[in-house]
Amino acid sequence: YTSCADVGGCPMAAAVLHRIDRMLSERPEIRNKVTLMSVSFDPERDTPARMAEIKQAMQPKTDWHFLTSRTAADLQPVLDDFHQSIAKLWQEDGTWSGLFRHVLKVFLLDTDHNVRNIYSLGFFNPQLVFNDIETLLIEQNQQATRSP
């Protein structure tokens, strides 16, 4: 996450999430109903301490978690659940290049942890995501008022 060399990938996603964080912070009626999570595929470099540094640098205004795992094996069940594949890129001499190949996916989950939308590179726009968050919250409020 923190070592991604593709400026149109993880760094762009972080910038969009940062903008969403700011948009949420301007809406006190919904900011405490949303949690943002950034998850690293690279536990070797993205240690808990490194992720804490990134969080401090981003200065989130909302509930935004920067997550990593102990090992790649620990992360694999989560990746499998979300159908997210990643692969280390190897150099010709057999050493790891330090890079990963993956499709950028950002997931919008509802309060029951159901995937409600998946944003890819071309559709990860802060206003679009914010509108989808508002739509989910409206839907949840309507369901809550209908429940006995």
Located regions from the model:
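Structured loop/turn residues at secondary-structure junctions
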Residues: 2, 42-43, 121
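Conserved redox-active cysteine motifs that mediate thiol-disulfide chemistry
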Residues: 1-16
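Loop/helix-junction capping segments adjacent to catalytic residues or to phosphate/diphosphate-binding pockets
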Residues: 7, 45-48, 123-127
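Structural microenvironment flanking redox-active thiols in thiol-disulfide oxidoreductases
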Residues: 12-78
